[in-house]
UniProtKB/Swiss-Prot annotation:
Location of this chain's protein in the cell: Secreted
Tissue-specificity statement: Expressed by the venom gland.
Species whose genome carries this gene: Tityus serrulatus
Keywords: Cytolysis, Secreted
Function according to Swiss-Prot or TrEMBL: Causes weak hemolysis. Does not cause mast cell degranulation, LDH release, and does not have antimicrobial activity. Does not cause edema and pain.
GO cellular component assignments: extracellular region
Upper classification of the organism: Eukaryota, Metazoa, Ecdysozoa, Arthropoda, Chelicerata
Main location: secreted
Protein name: Cryptide TyPep-18
Gene Ontology biological process terms, A to Z: killing of cells of another organism
Length: 6
């Protein structure tokens, strides 16, 4: 999961 994945 990427930090930009909301």
């Amino acid at each position: 999961i990427l930090p930009n994945d909301k």
